[in-house]
A protein has these predicted regions:
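Active-site loop-to-helix "anion-binding N-cap" substructures in soluble metabolic enzymes
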Residues: 1-186
Length: 186
């Protein structure tokens, strides 16, 4: 990115009282101009602490939604309105309600990589780093873990005393990594 563009971005940030948050996954040039770079949890946390009235989010839609949920009075703008995480849409409200009807005492545990609509229907939202600790401390035996089945199965493997119900959500990038490829790479 040339200096002229960088200077223009800095000028606009001051004029618009804006801060730029960028996920690790975005291009290096975008990370260079960002005020903060990190994972979705870190950026959500930073979003609650920045004084600027406008947050420009360089990441996928659920990240921007999370920033808005945590900062309802701030303006949150997505750098790319089409950036999305397919896994975030792999469960719907009807499925949550169906599971609640079948298991009246279920706790709906939602991985943060989900839409605002799904978060609103859930009992608790977790990250990959705190999912095990939070689920372990839930009083409910029945756990509906959404949308990421792989993270849910890892948590379930550590908590045999709980009964897990899974959604078939997944990250298409992560599920394309197979044991055989890892063994071959060794």
């Amino acid at each position: 990115m040339n200096e002229e563009i960088k200077n223009e971005i800095q000028k606009l940030k001051k004029e618009k009282d804006a801060v730029i948050l960028a996920h690790y996954y975005v291009d290096g040039e975008v990370q260079e101009i960002a005020d903060y770079v990190g994972d979705s949890y870190y950026l959500a946390e930073i979003a609650t602490k920045v004084p600027e009235s406008t947050i420009v989010f360089c990441g996928v839609s659920f990240m921007g939604e999370s920033a808005k949920i945590l900062n309802p009075k701030k303006r949150v703008v997505m750098a790319d309105g089409h950036a999305d995480c397919p896994m975030a849409h792999m469960v719907d409200v009807d499925k949550i309600r169906e599971v609640r009807n079948e298991y009246p005492d279920v706790s709906v545990v939602c991985y943060v990589n989900s839409t605002a609509e799904i978060k609103a229907e859930s009992d608790v939202c977790v990250t990959s780093s705190n999912a095990l600790k939070i689920v372990k401390n839930l009083p409910n035996k029945d756990i509906f873990f959404i949308p990421d089945e792989n993270l849910g199965r890892f948590v379930a493997s550590q908590l045999p005393e709980k009964h897990f119900i899974f959604n078939d959500g997944f990250c298409h990038v992560h599920t394309s990594i197979h044991k055989e490829e890892l063994q071959k790479a060794k």
